[in-house]
Amino acid sequence: MSTLIILRRIQVENANAIAGLTYGFPAITHFLGFTHALSRKLQASHGLTLEGCGVVSHQHQLHAYGSSWERSFALTRNPLTKEAKTAAFNEEGRMHMTVSLLIRCDGQIPADTTALCEHLKQQAQCQRLAGGTVIDIERVTVQSLPVDEAETRGVMRRLLPGFVLRDRTSLLHRHFQTLQQAKPQAEMIDAWLDFAALKMQAERDPSDETVQWKYLPKPGDGGFLTPLMIGYRAISPLYAPGEVDKTRDPHTPFCFAEAAYGIGEWQGAHRISDISQILWEYDYQNGDYHCRQVADTHSVAEDTSYEFDY
């Protein structure tokens, strides 16, 4: 039997805002990793399994400064070294955010969920989310999984104001095919950059020899589209434990990997009519580790022939 666990308005401080080539919001892998860690604890304590996770963003504050064209991350100043010199540091992108997580749970739920909700809140606050510290969770609820549009909209209305992260990687697939018809030498990275870049085009006015700069909309059918890191792809064979030096765990097989990218869309929570449309899940195949939504049936993540070729 499937139920829905809702962690309402999780306040996170100093979360990681950089994800591969993108910045501004943590990668979806962070949220599925948070769900996986919580699932392992629930399996041991209650025999429950967490399968999918939906993300609703209520508020975020990126630690950056500058104009709308040039922005720099606001970095911490480390203490001086013992030689009274400036200490070395790695550039980091941090942000504060308030999010809600909707998690599908499989297993037998007790009739009285009070103790389970308290246990979930305690365990979730002990974890890191996207490398940030969980400061507070407004409320934890456990309820039956919505089965129709009316029940789903009732759940989502209680999460307003907020925006849901949807998987729209299928748009990248379609745009790449269109781009190749005009430019046969185009690669997947070119199609992805069309979604990531802010483009302007000059239109000349023949009457007075002036030009007007106009914004070029992103490919697709509208919506708040954003580049997204969706997982990892293997770039080497699987090595035996201990074969590669200086790995984090010398007792586990090792493989080199690179980030995989897709396209996401932020949609108002009031527009969601099916809860399964917003649940992200793991997808393992052929050395690929991707996060995807079942609703995006033509995801590029399913087709290994579509990949970035640097």
UniProtKB/Swiss-Prot annotation:
Entries under InterPro entries matching the protein: CRISPR-assoc_prot_Csy2 (IPR013398)
Usage in biotechnology: If the spacer DNA has a perfect match in the chromosome then toxicity results. Suppression of the toxic effects occurs via mutations in the CRISPR/Cas machinery, or via target deletion, which might contribute to genome plasticity. This CRISPR/Cas system can be used to remove genomic islands, and possibly other genomic regions.
Key words, A-Z: Antiviral defense
Induction: Expressed in late exponential phase (other phases not tested); part of a large cas-CRISPR3 polycistronic operon.
Keyword Protein biosynthesis (UniProt): no
Superkingdom: Bacteria
UniProt GO BP: defense response to virus
Range of residues in the leader sequence: none
Role summary: CRISPR (clustered regularly interspaced short palindromic repeat) is an adaptive immune system that provides protection against mobile genetic elements (viruses, transposable elements and conjugative plasmids). CRISPR clusters contain sequences complementary to antecedent mobile elements and target invading nucleic acids. CRISPR clusters are transcribed and processed into CRISPR RNA (crRNA).
Family of the protein in this entry: Belongs to the CRISPR-associated Csy2 family.
Subunit-structure text: Interacts directly with Cys1; part of the probable Csy ribonucleoprotein complex with cys1, cys2, csy3, cas6f and crRNA.
Protein name: CRISPR-associated protein Csy2
Organism: Pectobacterium atrosepticum (strain SCRI 1043 / ATCC BAA-672) (Erwinia carotovora subsp. atroseptica)
